[in-house]
Amino acid sequence: MQKGNIRIAIDKGGTFTDCVGNIGTGKQEHDTVIKLLSVDPKNYPDAPLEGIRRLLEVLEHKTIPRGIPLDISNVRSLRMGTTLATNCALERNGERCAFITTKGFKDSLLIGDQTRPDIFNLNIKKVVPLYDTVVEIDERVTLEDFSEDPYFTKSSPNEQEGILEGNSGEMVRVIKKPDESSVRSILKVLYASGIKSIAIAFLHSYTFPDHERIVGNIAREIGFSHVSLSSEVSPMIKFLPRAHSSVADAYLTPVIKKYLNSISAGLSHAEDTHIQFMQSDGGLVDGGKFSGLKSILSGPAGGVIGYSSTCYDKNNNIPLIGFDMGGTSTDVSRYGDGRLEHVFETVTAGIIIQSPQLDIHTVAAGGSSILSWKNGLFRVGPDSAAADPGPAAYRKGGPLTITDANLFLGRLVPEFFPKIFGPNEDESLDLETTTLKFRELTDVINKDLNSNLTMEEVAYGFIKVANECMARPVRAITEAKGHVVSQHRLVSFGGAGGQHAIAVADSLGIDTVLIHRYSSILSAYGIFLADVIEENQEPCSFILGEPETILKVKKRFLELSKNSIKNLLSQSFSREDIVLERYLNLRYEGTETSLMILQKYDDQWNFREWFSEAHKKEFGFSFDDKRIIIDDIRIRAIGKSGVRKEKTVDEQLIEISHFKKADVSKDASFTQKAYFDNKWVDTAVFKIDDLPAGTIIEGPAILADGTQTNIILPNSQATILNSHIFIKINQKAAKTLSKSGYELDIDPILLSIFSHRFMDIALQMGTQLRKTSVSTNVKERLDFSCALFDSKGNLVANAPHVPVHLGSMSTCISAQAKLWEGKLKPGDVLITNHPDIGGTHLPDITVITPSFSSTGELIFYVASRAHHADIGGILPGSVPPNSKELYEEGTAIYSELVVKEGIFQEELIYKLFVEDPGKYPGCSGSRRFSDNISDLKAQVAANTKGIQLIGSLTKEYDLATILKYMAAIQTNASESIKKMLAKMVEHFGTTKFSGEDRLDDGSLIKLQVIIRPEKEEYIFNFDGTSPQVYGNLNAPEAITNSAILYCLRCLVGEDIPLNQGCLKPLTIKIPAGSLLSPRSGAAVVGGNVLTSQRVTDVILKTFNVMADSQGDCNNFTFGTGGNSGNKTDKQIKGFGYYETICGGSGAGADSWRGSGWNGSDAVHTNMTNTRMTDTEVFERRYPVLLKEFSIRRGSGGKGKYTGGNGVVRDVQFRKAVTASILSERRVIGPHGIKGGQDGSRGENLWVRHSTGALINVGGKNTIYAQPGDRFIIKTPGGGGFGQYKD
């Protein structure tokens, strides 16, 4: 041992703590590895300290008693990673803290982005913020200019008027400074209440932090132990994620500091030891700078560093996929081009985190994921048995899990597992109980299917479905970002990774799997190898390409670099060991999606070229005519640790002089029966440490040791190297139906797999659409849907985007399929939005792409529907509140080819969007035609993505199989709906149900449902519904179809495929010419966003499920400009904005579904789930000041269960605009049921700045607002359920 040179790295996970130590030689053969339980209070109080003690005993060759401070004078480096912050966030046991924010915004984190996390869960469960209490400070700043200004007006600093230049270069208007005396009084009261940690987040503090600093300094003077300023924690635009991040820091960092102090107390003579911690960005930092916010992904980040450092070869530059499978989840990541991939906004434990983190995707499928059979499908997760009780085999009464399936199929080696199971933790794995539970589950499945599946086939089916679940996030980080997944190598690590890695790789088309010798402790090993990182970032708002920009940016780079280098030099790094990475966070003007672009070469300034390349790769396009904005300047200084450099896999392969196939009789420890490809096979079990480098093992085989089990499939070959296992997969030809030894027309395993794959296609289409669009509606508010259809237009899979699109898209596609039957050619793409042919309201533009087989047969369709912010009509935003005729709402497209044989028809689109709607009296063409074009191209790109993914599927399965399961998945959904409706009849003892409600204008929606399961009759009859109105509340039939589909999916209460099968058993009767089936030419814009909500309320009330929700979308639009559509007429430049506003959800009823529930506050319900634009983005883009966005307390109807509260949204205009509101429930409040009180009605108020007049504008109106005018929208609360008792 070299005195004073010991290196130690530790990763404390939820179950195990992994430790690596080296005596100082840096050679791998001198490493010592220890794995111990993270929680074992009978033997030690703290796992990392115990790990250090055990390592020192080995490395220093002496006995060290427990319970005394550990002398680490011989330890040069002590590095740690921990899941402490993540666990605190998940378990909600962090430090009590307060949230200090701008007046009017105390409820910001409660409202969030106004969406609900699960659109099909009627009992909405929003994430509860981490703070204990919230305090508002009367302060305010805003941005003086707005980016949507068609005349690009730029202000200059003017201190007298309170206009100052912010850190970003943007002009900031200081409206109200905080009163320090008042602040001091407020904080003293807060301090006296016992709160000692606070988070401060004020609007626009990313560029103007002065007010936060004033309040922060006062807080420190008073004695608060931790003060988190959002402007320091995350100086980036977007108030919501920045505020969440500051609160997370205040909640987690004190816990981290206490833990670090406890570690320090357990150590002695640490003066010369570098004690560092792994951050979420993959870099190490001194303990004094380690924060809760930056430790969220501490452990997983170590794994990324581990595999990237040991498995990437810069000579061949083959990118890697990290596959880290643990007990409760699987983490996947990507490493390519020798660089870590970072993201700057993620969600952990439901909390938005805005901080540099490695791009790691997690799926709820791990060794302890629970296996279940529901609605004819094999389910894996998301529920987990966790460590306690754990899998059934752990002898603690746990359920069947993936681990049990592997054990039952002979894919685990019980002899290699320690005897730590059972109540006394002294028994081996329990195969007997696992077998019994699989027998019971197999009997249930066979009864449901009238089949003869074996237990092995069932267990193997669950393994296949689990593998598909884990393949999905891999596609998300590769295909969804423009990478070809099959061109990667997959690196397996984690406790369960080796059991599934080859199968997952095979399903993805990857032919190489790498497993490092330290795969079971790779996170700890990555921490051992990691570099030290110093990050510095500042906001800015410069225009790339302007002459002064380069000088300004280089100056800032220099200032940030000096600080970072200084900090690393103080940690004993030489200047030669420090590498600087310079980044600019860039976006196109008018968009909000930015990319962090690295300066590739120190002597080059080609950021425009680098950004365009990155944008084209990520999103599929770039702009030549848009200016590029610099949002942030970032420096990442890397202190190279130089701990060790491992030889690459390819170098190791070259060095081996002799390869030898393993002799099972001599080299294997023993053989055991294992189940592969539907049969039991004698499978050799090898101890990894017994195999010399150069040994080749043909699958099937099991390579294992005390910490890992690696399954080598029959189509694979493993080569043992000095530090890796190198596995090649013989890629199979296209798969056909599984020959499983039983005769079933539909294989339930394949049905489960195709359910995942079809949904994955729709989800990836949505990802592509969001990435490639430019409008706020699509990119920020997520007002779009994507889906896959069969050749008749029947819905096969619809991603859970916007509920009102769900059933209506199928009506649209099937109508187009009939209209164009036999006429479409490859390269054709359709466009439509007309309510007569399956459209909903005109702004929802549907783009449809047919797909053809190699023989020219049309085999399916993909489609995307997106809300366009302006398509012409009488008002900006194309959502006029008082439209009477369809033409007033904008362009109405019955059916056209937007792409004809591969050629985008831009002239036709101009005619449709600008010329045609502008011909009508009082109407304009589209006011944002460039956005229309961009979003249409994005929709075409999303459809193209869907067709490409189906093409990939045809390489795995033959076309006949795919088409067969497209039909089967619809049948499965149909059967699930029929079972649910039959249960309802059985519970209520009746076959007839009825409900009704009236709109604010008195129009009646009436429903009678007749369910006779024995006759297969399921009738939804809307006879008695009022006639269509001379207004825009008319709802095309497709909308009612959507409402029924949505409600039925919610009532099932379980995860079933969402497709046309849900509606196939039903007979839907809607009287022609009624409100729900208007004649051609009727105005419909309100039908989609208002009547749809009320139809949903009626259906849910009919089945006694819940009281009315707000029954409204609160559609708010404003803007300026327009044109007649005539190219020779002068166009008035302008802009348009559209948003929908949340309200209260109805209380749940005590019913056949179980006990009721309280409604949720401030959330979108029923047929919409679009996001609210972030306040800072809202004020940056438009000439507005948001005065208040808060919960409207007391607006929910009281009852046994209380309805959720609505919100108050107070918008002040800073320029003259036309503003409109289209809303309901302003006359008749949301109804309570069974004695529950009604929710409060909504209210829309106009405050005129010139006179101070307060005017109620009613539910549907347009105003012509002047600067200083305010529009206050108070949204309805939800109805209550049951009698209220004080």
UniProtKB/Swiss-Prot annotation:
Asked whether the UniProt record includes Cytoplasm among its keywords, one would answer yes
| Consequence when changing G497A | Impairs ATPase and 5-oxoprolinase activity
Top-level enzyme category: hydrolase
Q: What reaction does this catalyse?
A: 5-oxo-L-proline + ATP + 2 H2O = L-glutamate + ADP + phosphate + H(+)
Q: Which InterPro entries match?
A: ACX-like_C, Hydant_A_N, Hydantoinase_A, Hydantoinase_B, Oxoprolinase-like
Query: A Pfam family for this UniProt protein?
Result: Hydantoinase_B
Which GO terms of the cellular component aspect does the record hold?
cytoplasm; cytosol
* Keywords on record: ATP-binding, Cytoplasm, Hydrolase, Nucleotide-binding, Phosphoprotein
- Sequence intervals crossing the membrane: none
Instruction: Look up keyword Phosphoprotein and say if it applies.
Output: yes
The record's comment on protein family reads:
Belongs to the oxoprolinase family.
Please report the name of this protein according to its UniProt entry: 5-oxoprolinase
Q: What is the lineage of its organism?
A: Eukaryota, Fungi, Dikarya, Ascomycota, Saccharomycotina
